[in-house]
Swiss-Prot record:
One of its GO terms (biological process) is chromatin organization. It comes from Xenopus laevis (African clawed frog). GO terms for molecular function: chromatin insulator sequence binding; DNA-binding transcription factor activity, RNA polymerase II-specific; RNA polymerase II cis-regulatory region sequence-specific DNA binding; zinc ion binding. Gene3D superfamilies: Classic Zinc Finger (3.30.160.60). Keywords: Chromatin regulator, Developmental protein, DNA-binding, Metal-binding, Nucleus, Repeat, Transcription, Transcription regulation, Zinc, Zinc-finger. It is found in: Nucleus. The lineage of its organism: Eukaryota, Metazoa, Chordata, Craniata, Vertebrata. The zinc finger domain is essential for erythroid expansion and acts as an activation domain whereas non finger domain serves as repression domain. InterPro entries: Znf_C2H2_sf, Znf_C2H2_type. It holds the Pfam family zf-C2H2. The keyword ATP-binding does not apply. The gene is gfi1b. This is Zinc finger protein Gfi-1b. GO terms for cellular component: chromosome; nucleus. Essential transcriptional regulator necessary for development and differentiation of erythroid and megakaryocytic lineages. Alters histone methylation by recruiting histone methyltransferase to target genes promoters. Plays a role in heterochromatin formation.
Length: 343
């Protein structure tokens, strides 16, 4: 028997030996080739169903055992997700994730012969287009939180631990979403700080002047500027001063004519998101602010505040010339123009 034939025969019968991680990492194609075998009816040879080895091509398709004859309900190979015996070498790399049916509860035990602790799934991830999870995410945040198949996560709304609010982490956008208020954060730390300040229910920092409580010392410090007359934030363009830096930042949008918030109904743009939201009530007809005395509803909270003064009789705007009081600032301005000739 020629030596070349013996080499090819040895190669044929040693090709499908299981290769473990200690020798070499198994790739996606090798995994399928290892799991799915075809047997020749003329000789004891066993080889991958879609093997491209020249020696194995000598076995004609008629001699390969069919899938129906090979299938066994108790065969562990039937439990492996996403794989099909009809896979060909050319079509394997182009398999779409949408055409695969994932198992709800995947049991890795059928793969015990091919999987070890150090097994690398990178090849399968790239082959099937799995969502890549950034390496800097701590494993504790991924547990019961990330779903590789984009299924909505089940969130325990009664849990107070801040980390539970990271369950809507989006690997594709690399962002973290608060499930309470839908705010988006770029880091897990930012989300945790937000939950601790806004949703934990604890406000240990109390204002000694008005009694309002806050969840963080910085918020209390910013609030104290409201009670003081100091306006330390000045606009360099018009000289107007403000008590808060955030108010100054909003004011600067007027000079730059930046209106980043458009109305989704009419396209009108606004400087602030709150103004845009109030404007949308005109299109939707929504009136979320209701008077507790007479039941009248308003689309804007400022209109409700002005309306409530009719029930209380409160007149915060007074004329400095005749001391007459008014419930609205616009009424005071008209009074000064009509009665005192001032503008």
């Amino acid at each position: 028997m020629p030596r070349s034939f013996l080499v090819k025969s040895k190669k044929t019968h040693t090709y499908n030996q299981h290769r473990y991680v200690e020798e070499q990492p198994v790739t996606g194609v090798d995994l399928v080739a290892t799991v799915y075998h075809a047997h020749c009816t003329e000789c004891p040879a066993e080889f991958p169903a879609f093997s491209t080895d020249p020696t194995e091509k000598q076995h004609t398709p008629e001699n390969v055992i069919t899938e129906e004859a090979r299938s066994d309900p108790g065969d562990p190979r039937e439990k492996i997700p996403f794989l099909s015996r009809s896979i060909s070498p050319n079509s394997f790399q182009g398999i779409a994730l949408s055409s695969m049916r994932p198992l709800k509860h995947y049991d890795p035990s059928p793969l015990s012969a091919f999987y070890t602790q150090n097994f690398s799934w990178d090849a399968l991830h790239s082959t099937y287009g799995f969502k890549q999870i950034p390496s800097h995410i701590h494993p504790s945040m991924l547990q019961n939180s990330i779903n590789l198949y984009s299924c909505p996560p089940r969130v325990d709304s009664d849990s107070d631990h801040p980390i539970n609010y990271s369950m809507s982490y989006s690997p594709k956008m690399d962002t973290y979403h608060c499930v309470k208020c839908s705010k988006v954060f770029s880091t897990s730390h930012g989300l945790e700080v937000h939950v601790r300040r806004s949703h934990s229910g604890t406000r240990p920092f109390v204002c000694n002047i008005c009694g309002k409580s806050f969840g963080h010392a910085v918020s209390l410090e910013q609030h104290l500027n409201v009670h003081s007359q100091e306006r330390s934030f000045e606009c360099k363009m018009c000289g107007k001063t403000f008590k808060r830096s955030s108010t100054l930042s909003t004011h600067l949008l007027i000079h730059s004519d930046t209106r980043p918030y458009p109305c989704q109904f009419c396209g009108k743009r606004f400087h602030q998101k709150s103004d845009m939201k109030k404007h949308t009530y005109i299109h939707t007809g929504e009136k979320p602010h209701k008077c507790q005395v007479c039941g009248k509803a308003f689309s804007q909270s400022s209109n409700l505040i002005t309306h409530s003064r009719k029930h209380t009789g409160f007149k915060p705007f007074s004329c400095d010339l005749c001391c007459k009081g008014f419930q609205r600032k616009v009424d005071l301005r008209r009074h000064r123009e009509n009665q005192h000739g001032l503008k």
